[in-house]
């Protein structure tokens, strides 16, 4: 049983051609057949089937189906579901069980979604390949010797492999968009504050945003509409009115659309196949009536440096709570309080997490705060000003999602700087807080997926999804 979109699934459910239980069982069986790909850290066999039966029973009794009636969804394992393990793919939280639902979980349940499992990820969302998980790497469904991207690699792989119709991820610097590009699906990071972060385990609080991974922009828009909106439990959530995304998407046309193309995104190090596919897609849109506008985004070379200074500083603070005293892993090798703190964190955290904590502690230290952290914040403001100015002249900024296609498992693990460059095109949207999306545009010479990255102005998710839909529809 396979559905290419939620609309197809919903039509079958409402027509009585299938049931929520049959659909859920089909997805769970497929997950079991793909267990060697290490996509899921937990599968909710009994809970998912029980919920599906409950939805079927209510529908048969005349109940009104919710907007996501029967939608099989996978959830990244840094989002809280009451009664389920919440590991963040880390040994330090290996046996921790969440005691509450995240706001997004509550809202999805209220619209009759079915959660089928928690997906693998880079530990505490720190990584670009899903190789930093304490529970092993995830295989890319297109080539199991290659990475699916990260940190939401499990969620992206689940959707790409047909193990979930839609999945949730979190995006700090590209962790939804980059794996979407590597797995040939749509990955949306909304405007910062569009979706409540209550119940999302924090990596870098001024960057983190829950995002959506789906096979098409229509499904992404539907789920976004359910989750979006202010939340009194998250002071950073925005009270900006939630749009009718379907209407805004329908209003988008290639005719007269102004697409900004930054020269900084097409440098010599860009993979030739990626450059060719992106330019071909832009030319295709130009032929349909869009206008390609050459733009420049000064300071782009500083994006990665500023980003890693800021997010590691925030991570060093956020992860201080994992100390072995209150919850999570506690080292047995300690005879005093200080040893408990040190040993629990040393044994519980992985290599990349410890690297980022140490870097963040360093840039926040008294002698280096002004030299690094303060300057990075100033660069962030420059980026916000430059992107705001650019989007006053164009409707969308377009470029590659990643400088290269999916790489082999283990290829970049010994070179963290090279790994960080995987996010060079996605980081700017996170720095400024604007909505961004990766949309599949074709395949390279090795038949590996390539994605295009789009950025719109604050709270223009409807326009962004509409443009993504134009691009994706033209390759189907």
UniProtKB/Swiss-Prot annotation:
Enzyme class per UniProt:
ligase
Q: Which UniProt keywords apply?
A: ATP-binding, Ligase, Nucleotide-binding, Protein biosynthesis
User: Which GO BP terms, alphabetically?
Assistant: translation
| Entry EC number(s) | 6.3.5.7
Q: Please, which domain of life does this record's source organism belong to? A: Bacteria
**Active site annotated at which positions?**
76 (charge relay system), 151 (charge relay system), 175 (acyl-ester intermediate)
Question: What start-end ranges are recorded for coiled-coil regions in this protein?
Answer: none
InterPro entries the record matches: Amidase, Amidase_CS, Amidase_dom, AS_sf, GatA
Q: Which reaction does it catalyse?
A: L-glutamyl-tRNA(Gln) + L-glutamine + ATP + H2O = L-glutaminyl-tRNA(Gln) + L-glutamate + ADP + phosphate + H(+)
- An MF annotation (GO) of this entry: ATP binding
Gene Ontology cellular component list: glutamyl-tRNA(Gln) amidotransferase complex
Q: Which family does it belong to?
A: Belongs to the amidase family. GatA subfamily.
How is the quaternary structure described?
Heterotrimer of A, B and C subunits.
The record's HAMAP family line, in alphabetical order, gives:
GatA (MF_00120)
Summarize the protein's role.
Allows the formation of correctly charged Gln-tRNA(Gln) through the transamidation of misacylated Glu-tRNA(Gln) in organisms which lack glutaminyl-tRNA synthetase. The reaction takes place in the presence of glutamine and ATP through an activated gamma-phospho-Glu-tRNA(Gln).
Checking PANTHER family in the record gives: GLUTAMYL-TRNA(GLN) AMIDOTRANSFERASE SUBUNIT A, TRANSAMIDASE
What is this protein called in UniProt?
Glutamyl-tRNA(Gln) amidotransferase subunit A
Task: Recall the taxonomic lineage recorded for the source organism.
Answer: Bacteria, Pseudomonadati, Chlorobiota, Chlorobiia, Chlorobiales
